[in-house]
Regions:
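Short hydrophobic segments within beta-strands
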Residues: 29-31, 152
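Bacterial Sec-dependent signal peptides at the C-terminal "C-region" and cleavage site
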Residues: 10-24
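C-terminal accessory extensions appended to soluble enzyme cores
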Residues: 265-301
Length: 301
């Protein structure tokens, strides 16, 4: 059984015991998009396996940027009925859904942690974090002053994403750029970072991931909900082209993300985590846990 003692939360919560100060457990609100809602399948189960009571709530709009979040906040100021977000919540294993806006969500509970992130297609642009990210931080501090604001570092795409060609660089350079942008934003505002983009990069390096013309090579990004043999197809020129998602996490990636978040937010021994979905091998889970644990000690590489 894992234990909850410190980590990011201990700094603000004073080493809350596993029983928590609230019957709902540690309350985490994610103001995000498709790069955060993917935590809903596995993070509650990992937390339960660790004996950590968790109330996890996701605000989701696909591809939602920091600028759009703030546009929504301003729209809500003139229209209280404006509820553009899908809300998914898992409180001690009980799941609910609804519609909500950012301001109402921030006041819904006394959140212990509120997480934010940039939309992935802007994440490599440091200028995209300002002023909208700063404004969102100010709104969170206004409506949820007790909450610890934590930034999730998102990940770089696989080589098949056409946007990389448009931008003029590959996955590694995208990572270096977003890594620097998130680091600068977090430092400016005094936030902790969940280094999942770095975790994905470490996975690619240490597995190692070897892309081929018709394979993701073991990556945790790409090929979601598709069998390996269905991820690529021949085009009219008989060249292999992707036949699936090439930038979201696949199912294994979602489990990996849950482990990295668990290690970042709580003082847990991931080696003791018994929960593992059947599509993750023992060796894969071992490497995921090793990377997550190492990044907890040295999160910014």
């Amino acid at each position: 059984v894992c234990c909850l003692l410190s980590g990011i939360l201990a700094t603000v919560l004073g080493c809350k015991s596993s029983s928590g100060e609230d019957e709902k457990g540690t309350k985490v609100l994610m103001i995000g998009n498709s790069f955060s809602i993917c935590l809903m399948p596995h993070l509650p189960k990992v937390a339960e396996d660790c004996g950590v009571p968790l109330d996890l709530c996701s605000l989701y709009i696909g591809g939602c940027s920091l600028e759009r979040h703030m546009d929504n906040v301003r729209s809500n100021a003139v229209n209280a009925a404006f509820k553009p977000y899908r809300m998914d919540r898992c409180t001690l294993g009980e799941r609910t859904q609804g519609k909500i806006n950012v301001c109402d969500a921030l006041k819904l509970e006394a959140w212990d942690v509120v997480t934010i992130q940039q939309a992935s297609h802007y994440s490599w642009k440091p200028e995209s974090f300002h002023p909208h990210g700063d404004q969102l931080v100010a709104k969170i501090r206004e409506l949820a002053p007790q909450a610890k604001i934590v930034v999730q570092e998102t990940w770089s795409y696989t080589p098949w994403d056409k946007r990389l060609k448009e931008w003029g660089f590959g996955p590694d350079e995208m990572y270096e750029k977003l890594h620097a942008a998130y680091g600068a934003f977090a430092t400016k505002n005094g936030h902790s970072v969940i280094p999942f983009g770095t975790a994905v990069q470490e996975w690619r390096r240490r597995l190692p991931v070897t892309y081929t013309e018709n394979s993701f090579g073991g990556d945790v990004v790409g090929g979601r909900n598709r069998a390996k043999e269905d991820c690529f197809k021949r085009d009219a020129d008989y060249k292999w082209v992707p036949n699936c998602d090439v930038f979201h996490l696949n199912e294994r990636g979602e489990y990996f993300q849950a482990l990295v978040w668990m290690a970042s937010l709580f003082d847990v021994d991931l080696k003791e985590v018994g929960y593992k979905p059947p599509f993750v091998t023992d060796d894969e889970a071992k490497l995921m846990k090793e990377i997550a644990a190492e990044l907890k000690e040295t999160p910014r590489r």
